[in-house]
From Swiss-Prot:
Induction: By limited inorganic carbon availability. This is Membrane-associated protein slr1513. Keywords: Cell membrane, Membrane, Thylakoid. It is found in: Cellular thylakoid membrane; Cell membrane. InterPro entries: N-reg_PII, N-reg_PII-like_a/b, N-reg_PII/ATP_PRibTrfase_C. One of its GO terms (molecular function) is enzyme regulator activity. Its main location: membrane.
Length: 110
């Protein structure tokens, strides 16, 4: 049986990786996935004018599963208030259902 969850997604500049990871850890979230990503937005046009996934200029995408929407919104608010006036980024929340995940669901499973 699936366990309901909230998937918080944060896409921003790679330079913020450690700072955002610290906010997520401090929130009590059980973990996250982070990956390099690229794309184009109002503040994400690289010098070539093309979407970019190079290591130097790459963006990152965090995916965080939370049990409550409140926790997801708390993380989102802290990140946006602290960094998004000076750095490019977008944050969104999706409903999710966890099918398997020892840390999220416990030893008995979901």
């Amino acid at each position: 049986m699936a366990k309901p969850a909230n998937k918080l997604v944060i896409v921003t500049e790679k330079i913020l990786l450690k700072k955002i990871a610290k906010i997520i850890d401090e929130s009590g979230a059980k973990g996250y996935t982070v990956m390099n990503t690229g794309g184009k937005g109002s503040r994400n046009v690289r010098s070539s004018g093309q979407p970019n996934t190079s290591d130097i200029e790459a963006n990152i995408k965090f995916e965080i599963l939370t049990e409550t929407r409140e926790m997801a919104e708390e993380i989102a608010d802290r990140v946006a208030v602290k960094y998004f006036n000076d750095y490019a980024g977008i944050i969104y929340i999706c409903s999710a259902e966890v099918l398997y995940g020892h840390t999220f669901c416990g030893p008995e499973g979901c």
